[in-house]
Amino acid sequence: MNPQSMKEQIRLDIELAVQRRVAVSVGDRFGTQSALFRRQFDEANAVSHRVQQTERLRAIKNKVVYLTTEIENRTKEVESLIRFDPKKVDILEELTDKVEELEANVSFEVDRIQGYQERYHGGQQTSLPDCNGELETTLTQWRLEQAPRCPP
């Protein structure tokens, strides 16, 4: 509700309250059959009618604003969904499969190296291996131990 219509609503509410109070007072003082009371009563009813019209109009405006907002929101949703590319889902699936495959390969190699080391060295390496192949295997294992872990 904008400030101008809010002021108008407050003015009408105050006017209605005053008109009704005056009508009750005139009715008590001069009776409900007097012309003065009838005039005041009609005036209070007219203000009451204007208040009801204003409230109906405000309710309609609120509904229009609500509908406009909903249309804007739905339009934004549609625009977002239109930009969705189903091919990206396929790409994501392929990348996920590739990551899982690489993780499995790394795990297999690490397990193989650890098994080798446990069989031939009792799980601990205390000196440099004698042959070149063992040295490379040990260095590869150390590199893999320093590599960041990938969650399963």
From Swiss-Prot:
Annotated InterPro entries: DUF848 (IPR008566)
Keywords in alphabetical order: Coiled coil
Coiled-coil ranges from the UniProt annotation: 86-120
Highest rank taxon of the organism: Viruses
Keyword Coiled coil attributed: yes
Record-stated family: Belongs to the herpesviridae UL96 family.
Name of the featured protein: Gene 35 protein
The organism of origin for this protein: Alcelaphine herpesvirus 1 (strain C500)
